[in-house]
């Protein structure tokens, strides 16, 4: 039984005794509870509390005397929270939060997680009965109460997501099955997909010579379900079910990786988003692109730097992203998802409220999973915003992220109906009223539902027939509608409509903004119940004409095409519209701007100038320049107005700005000049004019790209020819050593390649890692490009910095056409690490056969002595190995380090290959020069079947390497629980030590696998075994910083005060690592706070040396001797004076340190103590 592993704890023993005394279930419950508590990373106190609560009705006061206050308190909390079960669904949430207020804040997190344990047991987390009514009820409690709580803790987000999907599985099994069905269809061999992408990215990282990491995640069925509803899309339209994230060193590497991804994969251009150049409003930065899956599932990729990743995970980007919340409700077969977002910001006496509410309703068909083409129909509506100015509203703060259902502004009063999952009951809103008299009124109001049938309304407005379909959901709240209309006359002037009318005794406001004729578009309908004493007839004020005109300008097709960043622009405008509207509207109306130009500050003129150029409001530009707008003023990215004009390709505005002093060579923060922007616009005349007006044609960006690089990357041959004609350096290199010819080859553009070479581009130019242009052509996979470059003199035998030729690349790609082309043009097939080695490693028998027929040496060796057969064995391809041996390859060949063919086969983990080699006389007992056997290599591979087979075939399970490592050491180091179990079952000696004195338990602790450590201890390994330097298992666990491992070792009898040969205890280690939690835990288990090392230094000396006030205070509080001396006669105060830490010194003196100890300090240091602590009266 699992729980029996920790029964050395007296509290647990007593709890188990009481449990068996009063409960019928003698075995399964404690076992399951122990598993759940460990999964939630709870300690023995929680396990004990749950056991006690199970028979709480039988306990008396005497029974409680055996347990400490923490355990008794946890039992009480579990008992209180269990009352939620008996509350109606609508009252569960408010009752849960009322109880939260009664829990000690310091213990609240542990108490909530502990109370979750019996709930998870009741829904039978390991054997769910999804149709069980009790399981449904408990999953509702978890969803309603626990998940919102866990989401408020970043550390528990993963647990919350796991529970979300678990409850989804219980509450909506048909929907989950449907989603899983689609997932299997979209990604039928997901493991292979992941493996291939990881391999490809490894190649990309190596080519760029960068240290990077790649991780992936598979979206949970619950997340997929929510997203399909919120985004109004079918599951097959999702791009991020499988998503990868590449973390690279810097911003430059992000773009380098992105370029290679576009070359290697078929990416979806419309899904490429550059959040690095154009960050989200919360500061989020990353490159997003989508790899096409053809007729199967697409794959999303995020590329970000280490700094960007930290900001996303832990900075403001993470915090703001988590503002979004949603709720799901279900009635019969109708599911409604309501998504809320609110931002409240207070500055300069303005409270800005930005609200986004989307409600989606869908009808569930339980048989949807049988029809891939079924796409549910949804409706939704868009954003609203308002702001107001008050006299003094600083006392009104909303400390939590809030989600308003409904917002009104009437007679200088702002009213918000707030639904805050952390503070407000499920079926109530918080009504907040704010007004100019600085009063704030809070009132809980019930969520009322009005039964209004879905309606169709038809009326005529501005010569347009309007047909409205709406379905109200909540009373006193906005709800969505879909409006369809047909244009009657060509000259109809369609404006935004704001209509108030009465329907079914409800006053209804409609706001909609038509964009295109003859189509459906979203509308917002708001309504309020009619009250006889109510003077409010309009919930939302009509949008102002200037706002509508601005939106029309933004949505103008020509403007958007010129700007080229619709999504970025829309986000920017929507976010800042409430604060910038008074200024932005001036751009739309130059006559109004002229009236108010003298009232606008210079900084606002500069801002208006850039914004006007971005939005295409060109009429305002001359007026702003005439009245002093600075054309060289920059925004936060270093962009000046001339950059904006160049990006839009506007030659006339560029001339006007330059005439008024704009710097034609101005650079942005990433080093892009105006000429770079002009090249991106593709305007040949603008580029020519800039060059003729002193724009630097040789200017480089921060990563070394010239304007020629840009022109080539945009495949603009006219611009390339123009730039060359004006003297652009065709051989200029980026910081990575890439020329424009590299770029042309990357894009596969034969015409540009020919153009550049004919104008002097070096066909053998190398990157910083030694790759020539020919390498890029092989990477692109085009025989035509390769042939063209060879015809122009490309060196087919040029080597990279690591000694590889282009033929290696071609062989690695498996492209026989390219290999043949290169060899027939003189590529050498027999280098040190031959082409044949590469072909064998890829497992490509046809390619190996072809190369040998073309005089590749089958007996060739690498510099480290590896033969072709070694590489073939590592590939795991039995047919290839068999073919090579039949063609006289040596089965007994060894590398310089003594590794045989069989070692390489074991490394691959291929049991069939290993079996075949041994049958063909390969030596099963062969050792490398370091003493590693075939079994050692098999243990490294982690292949359980292979290890088991080797043992059964007489491989020596007790074999040691030259340093004394057994197979068990290797298995423990890898953290492989099943492999260790297998070895123990087959009789390995678990207490065997290496030459340095390390046991398998030392290795297991370093692996961090708690279950593996527990298994070894259970099987009798010495928990207090020491290395040759005296380090115990506990020292290793403390050094690793694992509270769980330390707790387990202490429970299983580890000596907390054991010392190393230097006299260091585990407490010394914990203090040195500045780990407050570990120090506390060790002292709980009896660590000697005054233990001295061989130099006479206690843990307190260490705490002072490492300048940790918290540790000093904790040690003193637990009895550390503050006047103790080391072997040199120095007290801890000497160290304090050396580091001049006043706070620690005060702590010591208040704790009773003797500053008058004989010969303790010189007089000048004693005076320093008194000066540092002058505000303390020391007797």
From Swiss-Prot:
Species assigned in the record: Rickettsia felis (strain ATCC VR-1525 / URRWXCal2) (Rickettsia azadi)
Entries under CDD domains matching the protein: NT_Rel-Spo_like (cd05399)
Keywords: ANK repeat, Repeat
Keyword Repeat: yes
One annotated GO biological process: guanosine tetraphosphate metabolic process
Coiled-coil segments on the chain, per record: none
This protein's name: Putative ankyrin repeat protein RF_0381
InterPro entries: Ankyrin_rpt, Ankyrin_rpt-contain_sf, NT_sf, RelA_SpoT
Upper classification of the organism: Bacteria, Pseudomonadati, Pseudomonadota, Alphaproteobacteria, Rickettsiales
Highest taxon above the source species: Bacteria
Keyword Hydrolase: no
A Pfam family recorded for this sequence: Ank
Cysteine disulfide partners in this protein: none
């Amino acid at each position: 039984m699992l729980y029996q592993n920790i029964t050395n704890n007296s509290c647990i023993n007593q709890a188990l005794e009481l449990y068996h005394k009063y409960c019928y279930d003698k075995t399964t419950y404690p076992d399951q509870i122990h598993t759940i508590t460990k999964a939630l990373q709870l300690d023995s106190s929680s396990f004990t509390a749950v056991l006690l609560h199970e028979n709480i009705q039988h306990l008396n006061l005497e029974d409680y005397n055996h347990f400490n206050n923490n355990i008794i308190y946890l039992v009480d909390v579990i008992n209180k929270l269990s009352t939620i079960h008996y509350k109606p669904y609508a009252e569960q949430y408010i009752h849960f939060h009322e109880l939260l207020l009664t829990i000690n804040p310091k213990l609240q997190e542990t108490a909530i997680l502990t109370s979750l344990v019996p709930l998870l047991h009741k829904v039978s987390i390991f054997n769910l009965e999804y149709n069980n009514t009790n399981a449904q009820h408990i999953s509702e409690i978890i969803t309603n109460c626990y998940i919102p709580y866990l989401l408020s803790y970043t550390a528990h987000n993963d647990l919350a997501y796991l529970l979300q999907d678990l409850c989804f599985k219980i509450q909506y099994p048909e929907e989950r099955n449907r989603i899983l069905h689609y997932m299997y269809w979209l990604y039928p061999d997901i493991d292979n997909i992941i493996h291939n992408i990881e391999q490809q990215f490894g190649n990309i990282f190596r080519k760029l010579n960068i240290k990077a990491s790649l991780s992936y995640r598979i979206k949970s069925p619950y997340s997929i379900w929510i997203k399909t509803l919120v985004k109004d899309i079918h599951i097959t339209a999702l791009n991020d079910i499988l998503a990868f994230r590449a973390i690279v060193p810097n911003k430059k590497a992000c773009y380098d990786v992105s370029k290679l991804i576009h070359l290697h994969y078929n990416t979806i251009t419309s899904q490429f988003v550059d959040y690095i150049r154009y960050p989200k409003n919360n500061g989020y930065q990353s490159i997003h692109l989508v790899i096409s899956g053809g007729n199967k599932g697409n794959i999303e990729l995020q590329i970000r730097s280490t700094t960007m990743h930290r900001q996303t995970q832990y900075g403001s980007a993470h915090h703001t992203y988590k503002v979004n919340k949603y709720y799901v409700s279900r009635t019969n077969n109708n599911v409604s998802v309501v998504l809320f977002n609110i931002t409240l910001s207070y500055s300069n006496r303005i409270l800005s409220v930005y609200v986004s509410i989307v409600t989606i309703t869908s009808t569930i068909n339980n048989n949807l999973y049988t029809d891939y083409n079924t796409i549910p129909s949804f409706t939704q509506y868009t954003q609203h915003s308002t702001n107001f100015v008050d006299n003094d509203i600083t006392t009104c703060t909303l400390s939590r992220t809030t989600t308003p259902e409904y917002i009104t502004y009437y007679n200088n009063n702002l009213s918000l109906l707030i639904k805050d999952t952390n503070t407000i009951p499920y079926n109530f809103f918080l009504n907040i009223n704010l007004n100019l008299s600085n009063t704030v009124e809070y009132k809980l109001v019930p969520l009322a539902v009005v039964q209004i049938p879905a309606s169709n309304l038809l009326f005529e407005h501005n010569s347009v027939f309007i047909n409205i379909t709406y379905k109200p959901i909540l009373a006193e709240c906005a709800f969505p509608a879909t409006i369809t209309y047909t244009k009657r006359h060509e000259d109809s002037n369609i404006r935004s409509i704001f209509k108030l009318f009465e329907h079914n005794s409800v006053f209804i406001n409609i706001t909609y903004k038509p964009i295109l004729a003859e189509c459906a578009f979203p509308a917002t309908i708001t309504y309020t119940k009619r009250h006889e004493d109510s003077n409010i007839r309009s919930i939302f004020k009509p949008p102002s004409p200037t706002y509508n005109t601005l939106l029309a300008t933004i949505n103008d097709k020509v403007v958007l095409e010129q700007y080229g960043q619709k999504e970025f622009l829309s986000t920017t405008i929507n976010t800042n519209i409430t604060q910038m509207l008074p200024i932005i509207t001036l751009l739309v109306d130059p006559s109004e701007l002229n009236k108010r130009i003298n009232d606008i500050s210079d900084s606002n003129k500069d801002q208006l100038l850039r914004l006007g150029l971005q939005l295409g409001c060109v009429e305002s530009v001359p007026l702003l320049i005439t009245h002093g707008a600075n054309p060289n003023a920059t925004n936060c990215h270093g962009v000046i107005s001339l950059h904006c004009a160049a990006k839009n390709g506007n030659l006339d505005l560029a001339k006007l700005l330059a005439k008024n002093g704009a710097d034609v060579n101005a650079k942005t923060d990433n080093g892009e000049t105006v000429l770079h922007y002009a090249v991106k616009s593709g305007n040949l005349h603008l580029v020519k004019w800039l060059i003729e007006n002193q724009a630097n044609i040789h200017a480089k960006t921060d990563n070394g790209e010239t304007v020629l690089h840009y022109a080539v990357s945009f495949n603009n041959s006219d611009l390339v020819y123009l730039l060359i004609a004006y003297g652009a350096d065709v051989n200029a290199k980026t910081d990575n050593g890439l020329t424009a010819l590299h770029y042309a080859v990357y894009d596969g553009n034969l015409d540009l390649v020919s153009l550049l070479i004919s104008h002097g581009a070096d066909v053998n130019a190398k990157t910083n890692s030694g790759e020539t242009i020919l390498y890029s052509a092989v990477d692109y996979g085009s025989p035509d490009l390769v042939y063209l470059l060879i015809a122009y003199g490309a060196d087919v035998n040029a080597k990279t910095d690591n000694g590889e030729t282009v033929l290696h690349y071609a062989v690695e790609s498996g492209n026989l056409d390219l290999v043949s082309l290169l060899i027939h043009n003189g590529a050498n097939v027999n280098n040190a690490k031959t082409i044949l080695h590469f072909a064998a490693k890829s497992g490509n028998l046809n390619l190996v056969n072809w190369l040998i027929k073309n005089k590749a040496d089958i007996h060739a060796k690498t510099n480290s002595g590896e033969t072709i057969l070694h590489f073939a064995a590592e590939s795991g391809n039995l047919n290839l190995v068999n073919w090579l041996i039949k063609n006289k390859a040596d089965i007994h060949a060894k590398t310089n380090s003594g590794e045989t063919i069989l070692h390489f086969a074991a490394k691959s983990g291929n049991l069939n290959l290993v079996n075949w080699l041994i049958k063909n006389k390969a030596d099963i007992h062969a050792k490398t020069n370091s003493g590693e056997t075939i079994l050692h290599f098999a243990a490294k591979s982690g292949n359980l079947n292979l290890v088991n087979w080797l043992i059964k075939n007489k491989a020596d399970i007790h074999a040691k390497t030259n340093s004394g490592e057994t197979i068990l050491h290797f298995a423990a180091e890898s953290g492989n629980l099943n492999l260790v179990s297998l070895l123990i079952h087959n009789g390995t000696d678990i207490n065997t030590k290496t030459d340095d004195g390390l046991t398998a338990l030392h290795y297991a602790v370093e692996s961090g696998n708690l279950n593996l450590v527990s298994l070894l201890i259970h099987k009798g390994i010495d928990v207090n075994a020491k290395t040759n330097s005296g380090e115990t298992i506990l020292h290793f666990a403390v050094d690793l910083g694992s509270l769980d491992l330390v707790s387990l070792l202490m429970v299983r009898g580890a000596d907390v005060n054991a010392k190393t040969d230097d006299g260091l205890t585990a407490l010394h280690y914990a203090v040195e690592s500045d780990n407050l939690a570990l120090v506390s835990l060790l002292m709980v288990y009896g660590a000697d706070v005054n233990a001295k090392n061989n130099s006479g230094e206690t843990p307190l000396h260490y705490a002072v040396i490492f300048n940790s006030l918290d540790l000093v205070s904790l040690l003193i509080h637990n009895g550390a001797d503050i006047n103790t001396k080391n072997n040199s006669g120095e007290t801890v105060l000497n160290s304090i004076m050396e580091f001049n830490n006043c706070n620690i010194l005060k702590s010591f003196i208040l704790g009773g340190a003797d500053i008058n100890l004989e010969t303790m300090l010189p007089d000048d240091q004693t005076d320093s103590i008194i000066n540092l602590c002058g505000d303390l009266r020391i007797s």
